[in-house]
From Swiss-Prot:
Organism of provenance: Arabidopsis thaliana
Modified residues (N-acetylserine): S82
Name the UniProt record assigns to this protein: Rhodanese-like/PpiC domain-containing protein 12, chloroplastic
Active site per database record: C257
Keyword Coiled coil: no
Superkingdom assignment: Eukaryota
Length: 299
């Protein structure tokens, strides 16, 4: 017999439940460039303060164990897709795209019914939209891209040990979850200016890599590097909406600014748009001038 050991303090309606989540937990993981982020990413930023843990400093990353979480009283879930090698990567750096649905801890029969519906072929997004009490229901249960340390421990443990497209279950203080990992990626990488300089000596690299400079035109008049296309951060609204017509998400993309801060913002945003291999140039053009080429002016 399945026994409920926790309760959900939220009210029974989804709207009130969402408000209770917000009051219960606090965490600020707001994407700096939310202006043109996809809807599920804009929502994820908001929901991070509701569902994904208390204070990020209080959550210790946990290395997943080999087997999925099991709630006693339910049969094992079957796979909806073939296994991949997703969980064999570095959990510390890995980011996953998570979809889930949530019901209250005492809705055991509904949870079993939803599990059966899923196994019978119904889509997780449809089930989440109709039955989930999580605010993500309006996005089909999509939570967005998350990494270790951003979620409550029970949910994190289940999500980060799940294979791609495998559906697993877990229980948190908010209720019972069916969750699925839809995709995975490595975070934005840093590249030192010395390594960048070495790469730039290779004509093949200069031909194939995407080099973008997010500084303002007046800055670029003072100092610039060859091969970099200009995408000023202050003009984000003009070039961001159709960025994939200007840059290829499949290619290596290197982002430059003065000291590395603005470039990291844009690099993270590019990754959120599906760019697979994004590098932030550490220290920016100022570091390039100091460490590689003193002929580049500093300002």
């Amino acid at each position: 017999m399945f026994r409920v050991t926790g309760t959900l303090s939220a009210a029974s309606s989804p709207a009130v439940a969402a408000a209770s989540f917000s009051a219960a937990l606090r965490l600020s993981i707001t994407p700096t460039l939310a202006i043109a982020s996809p809807p599920h990413l804009r929502w994820f930023s908001k929901f991070s303060r509701q569902f994904l843990g208390g204070r990020i400093s209080s959550l210790r990353p946990r290395i997943p164990s080999p087997c999925p979480i099991r709630l006693s009283g339910f049969p094992a879930l079957k796979m909806r897709a073939s296994f991949s090698s997703g969980s064999s990567g570095s959990s510390a750096s890995r980011e996953i795209l998570v979809q889930h649905l949530l019901v209250k801890n005492n809705d055991v029969e509904l949870f079993a019914e939803l599990q059966k519906k899923f196994l019978d072929g119904e889509e997780m997004s449809d089930l989440a939209a109709e039955y989930s009490i999580c605010p993500s229901k309006k996005d089909g249960g999509i939570l967005g891209w998350v990494k270790l340390g951003q979620m409550v421990p029970e949910f994190e443990e289940a999500a980060f040990k799940a294979e791609l497209n495998q559906v697993v279950r877990c229980r948190t203080q908010f209720g019972l979850h069916l969750l699925q990992v839809l995709s995975e990626r490595e975070p934005v990488k840093d590249i030192q200016v010395e390594e960048l300089h070495s790469k730039m000596q290779d004509p093949v690299f200069m031909d194939e890599a995407q080099l973008i400079d997010v500084r303002e035109p007046n800055e670029i008049e003072i100092a610039s590097l060859p091969g970099f296309k200009v995408f000023p951060l202050r003009q984000f609204g003009t070039w961001a909406p159709d960025i994939t017509s200007k840059l290829n998400p499949e290619k290596d993309t290197f982002v430059l600014c003065k000291v590395g801060g603005r470039s990291m913002q844009v690099a993270n945003w590019l990754q959120s748009q599906g760019f697979k291999s994004v590098y932030n140039i550490t220290g920016g053009i100022q570091a390039y001038s100091l460490k590689v080429d003193p002929s580049i002016p500093t300002y």
